[in-house]
Structure formats: C-alpha cells, structure tokens
Design a protein with these regions (language model features):
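Amphipathic alpha-helical coiled-coil "transmission" helices that mediate dimerization
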Residues: 1-36
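Core catalytic ATP-binding domain of two-component histidine kinases
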Residues: 46, 52-263
C-alpha cells in the first residue's frame, strides 16, 4: 500500500535521529496528538450544540402548535413530534456521556458495535442533511482490545471525511467483521466520493497535509490533522490502517485492531 510504504520510510528516518533530536520529536508528537484530541473534542461540542438547538426548536414549535389547536388529531401529531425529538436528545446525551466517561488512554476489551452506534447517532443529522445513504453491516464479533474513545474519534473523522468527499445523495458503506485467522477486528469504511489521486496517497498521512482547500460549509476539515491523528491512534493500538482510492470511484479505509483474548 502506498500510504503504508511512506509511513515506513518516515519511521526509518526517525530511527536514524540522534537521541536528543529523537526526544524532541517524541515531545512534539505528543503535543500534536493532544492538539488533535482537542480539535476533535471541539468539533464534537459544536456538532452536539447544533443538534440540541435543532431539537429545542422542534419541541418549542410543536408545543406552540399543540397549544394553539384544540383538535385531538393535531395535538396527537404535535405530541408525537415532541416525543421523537426528546428521544433523539436522550440518544445524543448517552453518546456524549459515553465519550465523557472514557477520557483515559486505557486499552481494554471493548464492544466496538456500541462505539459505532454512538458515532452514528452524532452524525445522523449531518448525513441526512446531505442525503447520504449509509449502509452498515455489523457482524456479531468478540470484543476488541482498544480505547473506545480514541477509536470513536477515528470513526467520526473517517465518516466526516467520507461525507465531505461525496456529492449530494452518495453512499457510505460501513462494515464490522472478525478475522478469525489473524484474530483481528476488521472495520471498513468506503465511500462513493471523488477519490484521492494516486500521487497524493503517499502524503495523506503526513501532519498538516490536506487534499481539501479548507474547512467546508460546516466548518470541518482542511487542517490536515485528521488522518495523521487516526493513523497514530491505530498504530498505538498495534493495529493497521490500509487506504485504497480511485479518482471518480471513491475511497476505502480498512482498519485492523487486535481482538481481545477470551477470559
């Protein structure tokens, strides 16, 4: 894989550095990783704030409709809309609380399907806004040895990238499987987007390298930090990330993470 080969060359260059330079590189990498985590947290806060504002407006508008109209049919419809909005607010709250509860860097047996569910709750409205069709295949698999919060950060980043690469009405495919031979969890995210030119693939994991001109209309993307952060997280989990892309066809990210050993 071209991107993986570029990363191997980067690691070889780092290994040849003097001890003093190596220490400085390590410190800078740690600082960069913390900055990336704060960027992801800031985007999450912005997304959830916008979501709750939409929910509150829905509740307010239908409450006013219910108060203005006395016929049972209109009131019942208003109550149904208020109930649906409240249930969505509860799902978002649970997803955010799930992330907040796990702010540590502990790697432990984790139900990755739950992590995926929470991420999709947070992105549901955004995907709907751009009429993105999401097709998921979630197999029943053993727990994955990972840090749930960090893997959710990777998932949110890759799904947001996929959404940005797709024209209105495109498709994202998400698949979760278990490779019993390698004892690895396999997470695949594929989009029907614009694709990445082959000559840019070797650079896309470099910090601050971006194929985008800048943030999109939602304010996301364009810094070049996202994929670099994702790759470092997966590497720290002793996992692998493979990138395949074709211009005009789309891009596929395949992530392999260790399966937790049975107790």
């Amino acid at each position: 894989d071209t991107a993986e080969e570029a990363d191997t060359a980067e690691e070889a260059d780092t290994a040849e550095a003097t001890p003093e330079l190596q220490q400085q590189i390590t410190i800078l990498q740690q600082q960069l990783f913390q900055a990336q985590k704060m960027t992801a947290l800031g985007e999450l806060v912005g997304t959830t704030t916008h979501e709750f504002n939409n929910i509150l407006m829905t509740v307010l508008n239908y409450a006013q409709i219910g108060m203005r109209h006395r016929d049972d049919e209109t009131r019942d419809k208003a109550f149904e809309k208020i109930l649906a909005a409240s249930q969505r607010a509860a799902k978002i709250t649970n997803a955010v609380l799930g992330m907040a509860r796990n702010r540590s860097d502990v790697i432990e047996p984790t139900d990755l399907s739950r992590i995926i569910d929470d991420a999709l709750v947070l992105l549901e409205r955004e995907l709907s806004k751009y009429r993105i069709n999401l097709e998921t295949t979630i197999d029943e698999i053993p727990d994955t040895l990972c840090n749930g919060n960090q893997i959710q950060q990777v998932l949110l980043n890759l799904l947001t990238n996929a959404r940005q690469a797709i024209d209105m009405g495109g498709t994202i495919w998400l698949k979760l499987q278990h490779d019993a031979t390698e004892q690895m969890t396999v997470l695949t995210i594929r989009d029907s987007g614009c694709g990445i030119p082959q000559d840019q693939l070797p650079q896309i994991l470099d910090p601050f390298y971006s194929t985008k001109a800048g943030p999109d209309e939602s304010g996301k993307g364009g810094t070049g930090l996202g994929l670099s952060s994702c790759h470092k997280i997966i590497a720290n989990h002793e996992g692998r990330m493979k990138i395949e892309s074709a211009v005009g066809v789309g891009t596929q990210f395949t992530i392999l993470l260790p399966t937790a050993k049975a107790a």
